[in-house]
Amino acid sequence: MEIPGSLCKKVKLSNNAQNWGMQRATNVTYQAHHVSRNKRGQVVGTRGGFRGCTVWLTGLSGAGKTTVSMALEEYLVCHGIPCYTLDGDNIRQGLNKNLGFSPEDREENVRRIAEVAKLFADAGLVCITSFISPYTQDRNNARQIHEGASLPFFEVFVDAPLHVCEQRDVKGLYKKARAGEIKGFTGIDSEYEKPEAPELVLKTDSCDVNDCVQQVVELLQERDIVPVDASYEVKELYVPENKLHLAKTDAEALPALKINKVDMQWVQVLAEGWATPLNGFMREREYLQCLHFDCLLDGGVINLSVPIVLTATHEDKERLDGCTAFALVYEGRRVAILRNPEFFEHRKEERCARQWGTTCKNHPYIKMVLEQGDWLIGGDLQVLDRIYWNDGLDQYRLTPTELKQKFKDMNADAVFAFQLRNPVHNGHALLMQDTHKQLLERGYRRPVLLLHPLGGWTKDDDVPLMWRMKQHAAVLEEGILDPETTVVAIFPSPMMYAGPTEVQWHCRARMVAGANFYIVGRDPAGMPHPETGKDLYEPTHGAKVLTMAPGLITLEIVPFRVAAYNKKKKRMDYYDSEHHEDFEFISGTRMRKLAREGQKPPEGFMAPKAWTVLVEYYKSLEKA
């Protein structure tokens, strides 16, 4: 390639190189790639398919371009869509740092950005640009650069009135422009030419960031850039209101299969959308993907590590095989319809070995599996009515959709989830408080805690849900956790005690409900081996597995630091091995013993009112 002639001094570049005395290269030939876009699309991102395009955000300073672009980038990456944001301020610190704000420099600024965006799009990325780009001709040129390369280009006008932009004025630029300290400032003494026919207009003065992002995502879905299933919208399986009467009439006439309480809990999990994108109990293909890969693979890599299955006896199979649909009956009531059922063999030993890593018959959930029928039934589930347990706790059983709305109503910009099946002590609280503090330090303004106890089946020696909820309420009442930034809700899933395999399920379910961060601690979903008494799973593996698990890309894992009772400080504190003698590890066994005997724990271990609830629970056992 010919090197341009030397220049006597450094000059700013405009679109017309001749004006600056530059010699153009005349022996440049475009080199065609050996790799096609389709081939490149197969290896870029986690979903496959070429998605290269440019989303060109334009608008006044302060309109919200950077805010929307960064949020859109985060959303797409979290949903397996490769993308990158080119921000105006960032580009002017590097590639375009030799350009000013004259009309000529603005033109060259946009030209360079358009060329770079084209390369990103050609590489298979969704390239998001965030620039004022005030002139129609420059934006049209950017579009032509993409169209000349047969790449989609979407102009998005980020529209906010000038007075709103001035009120925001994060950088103080409007104030300086009004004072005459900045000349040629767009919107003040330099014109902004509004787009005449953009693909999308975002009214950022009336729509929040999430709404704006969803509008752009919908545009990309309409243009086949982003797959519809990439949005992970909650898939509820309740029959729509306008079809409910017909479905109930149908259910009464169908053959029936009786289900037990744990089955009913799984029906609730499916109905409320926790297992999105499942349409019902797993069919054989989904079951095999789950059992062997801990993921669903049709439509992208979606983490789903535990089989959600319905079992049947040989007699049930003989009676129902060949039916196009049958009703599920719980305690004499027809609660759902399973359509297009598929029967396949329930290989119990293989399932247990893969799901739990053991086939120990004394493991409480494995014991249930071994007692179940020899057949599994997959199918499309239609649930007739919302599921209530009438135990005084239904108000806490918020669905993923309801939780998302609640977080929105609270103006949460980050949601961190804490899953638990035990009472909360001050060590747990320390971790939650510290996570909240870290999120504030990272720039989040309104982090919200989802305190999300497991509400399905648990083994006999676990504290029952009703008592745990009383204990959690006492923790909030005493101010150990802030009620203003905490949502307490119940997760309806049964507990399987499957360690690192199950903790992926716990995590991804909270992801569906809108959590961005998930706190994981020592031995999550674990228990002592029923025969040896040792940990069934290595205590640190759950956290390690979560940080590596495929398909958990919309949230960040927050590993526990080990908390113990600091005898000197008389409070729960992060364990320091250099001062081991200052710390005491209070086991669950010792905690239960103290509560059972009505004794008080060490000062600062648990909120007093919360401890009183535990004492009352163990007293109730003695009376029983």
Swiss-Prot record:
Which tissues is it found in, per the record?
Answer: Expressed in the neonatal brain and in cartilage.
Source organism of the structure: Mus musculus
Assembly and partners? Homodimer.
Q: What is this protein called?
A: Bifunctional 3'-phosphoadenosine 5'-phosphosulfate synthase 1
Going by the UniProt record, its keywords in alphabetical order are:
Acetylation, ATP-binding, Kinase, Multifunctional enzyme, Nucleotide-binding, Nucleotidyltransferase, Transferase
- Which residues are annotated with the PTM N6-acetyllysine? K12
Q: Which GO terms describe its molecular function?
A: adenylylsulfate kinase activity; ATP binding; nucleotidyltransferase activity; protein homodimerization activity; sulfate adenylyltransferase (ATP) activity
Which family does the UniProt entry place this protein in?
Answer: In the N-terminal section; belongs to the APS kinase family.
